[in-house]
Amino acid sequence: MQTPVSVNEKKDFIRWFLNHYQLKRRECVWILNYLMSHDSLMEKVHFVEQAEFCPRGIIMSTHCVEEVPFRFYKENVMTTDAEKSFHDIRLNKQQDLFIQLNFRSAYSSPEYAAVLESNPHIPKNLFENKKDQGLAEQILEHAISTFQREKLLKDIDDALDRHDKEAFEQLSRQLNQLT
């Protein structure tokens, strides 16, 4: 569905997220900051929907939504103890970690769309209506494309402001490849 999300893109998103939203549990902030401080862990982080279906999934919610504050799933066992999940993350650094973030306007956020990956662990029969699933994927692809284009245009403007010809040319090539 999309190209892999880079470690830097994930870190940029987490920084943006923490600057714009307040999580219901402070331990969630600790976990996200811990993940950001270790590139090897960030390579294993995947932002997804419906993390409860994943072998190792975390659900975190902000104050602006009604969803549960925190849940950690590991092989069909669920806990609300953030310290246990933090311990598991530290001990199992080589395992993929799937994170679902519940926050206001998540589905209209281009920042979130840019790092959101399809969840390979969702049961096939969960999506009864394939037409809706296809439409949702098209909307997500469009949001990602729009976000990438806007980010490149901003970076090009910044390069022009700095009179950085090399960065301008490289970013322009990237923009041309998008279109």
UniProtKB/Swiss-Prot annotation:
Lineage: Bacteria, Bacillati, Bacillota, Bacilli, Bacillales
Pfam families: IDEAL, UPF0302
SMART domains attached to this UniProt entry: IDEAL
Protein family per UniProt: Belongs to the UPF0302 family.
Protein's name in the database: UPF0302 protein YpiB
